[in-house]
């Protein structure tokens, strides 16, 4: 009976880790393609620090999942105690890091207020400077969601660095102007009319409200997904340790 249980856990662990292995391989493939694609996508990514960072994050996640799945599959099939122990420790480290991140996110959630983002924007935003990660991120957000500032265009009246760099010649950055279509490379309808704050040439809604409304549902889904991932990792650690102890 004990042998049947161990055999069942062994195959369950192999199947699950095989899918983890495939997922990691897919992420690795996507990350490598984005960074080395010869058709021009590489140049687009290279001009945006945010996209470049995202591509490296995808690569890192893919590599981590690839290695994790490989260790789990080999440890289960070969019944290798050393691989199973390494797999257990690997999962344990990831579990503790994710748990710590979740606890920190819960503790500091109250700091991510409208006032906090407004203060950061007015203090650090540099306009169309894509070499500054903070400004490039804000520009991407404003263009993607069709919004302007945290609360609206009036935020940029207090943006000291932005006003200094533009010599007070611009009321709002180019990212606040409406485009057709709404993409980074889309044509601005009218930069002059946008600077005068006239509809329909400027996005007047603040990004805080737009993003909050957009992601309100997804926050709960992300929380449920995170709990599910932690539970799966916990079961994998139990399976790995049971196999480790059962293998003679």
From Swiss-Prot:
Where, subcellularly, is it found?
Answer: Membrane
TM regions (residue ranges) = 14-34, 50-70, 84-104, 224-244
Give the UniProt keywords, A-Z: Glycoprotein, Membrane, Transmembrane, Transmembrane helix
Checking CDD domains in the record gives:
uroplakin_I_like_LEL
Q: Name one GO cellular component term.
A: membrane
Q: In which tissues is it expressed?
A: Highly expressed in lung. Expressed in adult heart, artery and vein.
Show the Pfam families listed in the entry.
Answer: Tetraspanin
Among InterPro entries, the record links this protein to: Tetraspanin/Peripherin, Tetraspanin_animals, Tetraspanin_CS, Tetraspanin_EC2_sf
Taxonomy, superkingdom = Eukaryota
Q: Which residues are glycosylated?
A: 129
Result of knocking out the encoding gene: Homozygote knockout mice lacking Tspan18 are viables.
Q: Which residues lie on this side of the membrane: Cytoplasmic?
A: 1-13, 71-83, 245-248
An example molecular function term from Gene Ontology annotations: transmembrane transporter binding
Gene Ontology biological-process annotations: calcium-ion regulated exocytosis; establishment of localization in cell; hemostasis; inflammatory response; protein localization to cell periphery; regulation of sprouting angiogenesis; regulation of store-operated calcium entry
- What topology does the record note for this protein and the membrane? Multi-pass membrane protein
Protein family (similarity comment): Belongs to the tetraspanin (TM4SF) family.
Q: What does this protein do?
A: Plays a role in the cell surface localization of ORAI1 and may participate in the regulation of Ca(2+) signaling and the VWF release in response to inflammatory stimuli.
What PANTHER family does the database record attribute to this sequence? TETRASPANIN, TETRASPANIN-18
Subunit organization: Interacts with ORAI1; this interaction regulates ORAI1 exit from the endoplasmic (ER), and/or Golgi, and trafficking to the cell surface.
What is the protein name for this chain? Tetraspanin-18
The species this protein was found in? Mus musculus (Mouse)
